[in-house]
Every structure is written in structure tokens, then in C-alpha cells.
Amino acid sequence: MSVNHGQGNKDLAKTLLVMAGGTGGHIFPGIAVADELKAQGWKIHWLGTADRMEAQIVPMHGYDISFINISGLRGKNLLTTLVMPFKLLRSLFQARRVIKTVKPDVVIGMGGYASAPGGLAAWLSKIPLIVHEQNAAAGLSNRLLARIANKVCCAFPNAFVSGIDVEVVGNPLRASIGQQALVSENIDQSHEGSKNILVVGGSLGAQVLNKVMPDSFKDLSESDEKYCIWHQTGDNNQALVTASYKQEYIDTGKVRVTEFITDIAAAYQWADIVICRAGALTVSELAMAATPAIFVPLPHAVDDHQTKNALYLVKRDAAKLLPQAELNNESITSLIIELFDQPQTLADMAKASLSAATSDASQKVAKLCQQLSISNGAKLRNNEEKI
């Protein structure tokens, strides 16, 4: 177990321990809640793993992070299944040591490897525990913790099985996405003189999109010179994808290829249509940004949660669903042309997206943390008076 410092020590009244890691879909909602409570005077500490994304992202946002040793709970083979209880027990002891050191008033689990042992350690330490599920189908860690948590909340309806008291609050989003919603008032107006397509594959990229979209764009450009594309490839894919596009498209500025997009809110504002996977954070961000989308869910996602995420907007006529098994040059090209040929449909999709968005999820979750800290403090005072 180790600690990486990103936030100076301050004598603050309350402390929140955030458990979130592995992917940006867990981490960034946690940061959004942390930022909200920090602004209210709370001290923030993080629990994660040293070999995952949170080890770099969390300190960059100014928060201390402690690491425990834990990997996925789902056994990939017999040996992994047999040793998992021992690894979980070790990580539980590590998490309890962190809790004794940090002394949090509230612990919140957002998903990721550290959430299960950290949440169990909070329960054993009698620290109020909140669980937040970002996906439309709850992950294993959150399903387990939901049975012992003081409060369970989620982004999408029916994320948990019946019998668990759940509050639907939406996904906490970065402030820049919330500001983007203010720009979305003019969603009836398309970008004059261009038809802008944003391709987003996540931090690792989506190989199927990297392969299909260059050929699709060739056909699109031959049908209409107004098409422009911004293609985010993911780590180590930029050179290969760039080479797949015609050089003339890049020279004329019709094609932009980048590994990462640092200002995703600006990218959403630029785009008329986004073609992407259906991670929970992406779905929630697109709703808030009022940007029509074509979702190509990751086919092997656990419990097919990406398809379920996508359906939240698809069923509201705010997005289109194109299963990866049906994705090819012809299918994606025809769908893009069909949408751009119906500007009113795009405008209606944008309006439907915005109506499905939740703008105050960070504030709602922060309020739950405040309420739990107050009620638990009152309980402790009553116990002290009885003694």
C-alpha cells in the first residue's frame, strides 16, 4: 500500500474517501463529486490501484490517493478463482488501514477494483457508505456493496435488481460538460458550410471504428464535399489511422486525427453527429451536450452494459444503435447520409438528448454525502451521551 500526494493537508471539517478506478467512466464522475464537496469545504482522499488509470489522473486533479493491491473479482480460470479470496482479504486489510489513517466521514464507491474491499472495510469500520452506479447494468462490485451500503444511487433506471432501495440521480459530469449544455440552446441550427462527424473510441480507441471510418469517409466525401471528420484513435493508433485516410483530406483540413481529445466539451460542440462506443459517461455527456449519436456498443462488455447504456437514449429517439456485428462501410455510411439528409431529425434528436440529461447529479450525490455525515454524526453524539 502506498500514498501519492496531490492535495495539501488542510484542517477541514469533513473528509470524503472516494473509491473509483480502472476507467474514466468510474474516475471522472468521482472527480465531479469530489470537486463539488471540495468547494463546500470537504477534504478529499482517494482509494485505488497503482497500475490503473486513477494513479495518474487523480493526483493531476489535486487529490491524495492511497493504493491497495487488488484485481478483478471475476475469475478467468480455476487458479484465479481459488486465490481470489486470499487476495481480497489482503486488500481488505489494506483498505482498513487507509480508513484508520484518513478517518473519512463518508465513503463513496463509484466502481473499479478498489471499490469492493474499500466498501467492505468502510462497512466493518461503521463508516457511512454510498454506492453510485454509472452504467445501466450494475457491476459486480456495486451489486455486492449495494446490500450493505447506507445509500445506493445510479445514473439510469433499473440498474439494480428489485429489492434494493435505489435513487436515480444521473451521472456526475465534469463542469465543462455542464457549461456545454448552456451552449446547446441553439440546437436547431446546424454548422453552416460543413457536416461535422466526431469519432470517439475512448482512451484505448475502438479498433473497429479505426478500421471502418477511413473507408466510410472516402465514400462520404465523394458524395458531398461538406463532410469533415475528427477522429480520436486512442493510444498508439494515430499514425496508422492517419495513413488510412487520403492525404488530400488531411491537407485540406477535412480530416483531423488525434490520439486523445483533452477538451471533449468543445469537440461535442463542434460535432453534428458523434460515432462512438456507449460507455456510461459518454452517453451521459452526449445527452448533456445535446449531440446526436450513433452508438456502436462494445460487444463483449460485461453483462452487455454498453448496449443497455445506449438504449437509454435510443429509446428516446435521441440516438441510433448500430451493433458491431452489423457495422461495415456500407451500413455506417448510409446511416450518416440518412441523418444529414434529415436536418429536422437531427434537431429532434438533439432536443430529445437534452431532455434526457441530468444536469445536477454532482450536487445530488454531494447532498447525499452531507446528509449521511450529519446523520452519522448525530448518531455518534447520541451514543456518547448514553455512555
UniProtKB/Swiss-Prot annotation:
> Which InterPro entries does UniProt cross-reference here?
GlcNAc_MurG, Glyco_trans_28_C, GlycoTrans_28_N
Task: List cellular component terms (GO).
Answer: plasma membrane
Q: Kindly give the Pfam families that the UniProt entry links to this protein.
A: Glyco_tran_28_C (PF04101), Glyco_transf_28 (PF03033)
Q: Which reaction does it catalyse?
A: di-trans,octa-cis-undecaprenyl diphospho-N-acetyl-alpha-D-muramoyl-L-alanyl-D-glutamyl-meso-2,6-diaminopimeloyl-D-alanyl-D-alanine + UDP-N-acetyl-alpha-D-glucosamine = di-trans,octa-cis-undecaprenyl diphospho-[N-acetyl-alpha-D-glucosaminyl-(1->4)]-N-acetyl-alpha-D-muramoyl-L-alanyl-D-glutamyl-meso-2,6-diaminopimeloyl-D-alanyl-D-alanine + UDP + H(+)
Q: Which CDD domains match?
A: GT28_MurG
Gene Ontology biological process: carbohydrate metabolic process; cell division; cell wall organization; lipid glycosylation; peptidoglycan biosynthetic process; regulation of cell shape
What's the superkingdom here? Bacteria
Write the record's keywords in alphabetical order, separated by commas.
Cell cycle, Cell division, Cell inner membrane, Cell membrane, Cell shape, Cell wall biogenesis/degradation, Glycosyltransferase, Membrane, Peptidoglycan synthesis, Transferase
Q: How does it sit in the membrane?
A: Peripheral membrane protein
User: What GO annotations for molecular function exist for this entry?
Assistant: UDP-N-acetyl-D-glucosamine:N-acetylmuramoyl-L-alanyl-D-glutamyl-meso-2,6-diaminopimelyl-D-alanyl-D-alanine-diphosphoundecaprenol 4-beta-N-acetylglucosaminlytransferase activity; undecaprenyldiphospho-muramoylpentapeptide beta-N-acetylglucosaminyltransferase activity
Q: What class of enzyme is it?
A: transferase
In this chain, UDP-N-acetyl-alpha-D-glucosamine is annotated as bound at: 23-25, 135, 174, 203, 261, 280-285, 306
Task: Please give the chief subcellular localization of this protein.
Answer: membrane
Question: Where found, per UniProt?
Answer: Cell inner membrane
The pathway to which it is assigned is:
Cell wall biogenesis; peptidoglycan biosynthesis
Name the EC number(s): 2.4.1.227
Q: Which family does it belong to?
A: Belongs to the glycosyltransferase 28 family. MurG subfamily.
Q: What does this protein do?
A: Cell wall formation. Catalyzes the transfer of a GlcNAc subunit on undecaprenyl-pyrophosphoryl-MurNAc-pentapeptide (lipid intermediate I) to form undecaprenyl-pyrophosphoryl-MurNAc-(pentapeptide)GlcNAc (lipid intermediate II).
**Which protein is depicted?**
UDP-N-acetylglucosamine--N-acetylmuramyl-(pentapeptide) pyrophosphoryl-undecaprenol N-acetylglucosamine transferase
Gene behind this protein: murG
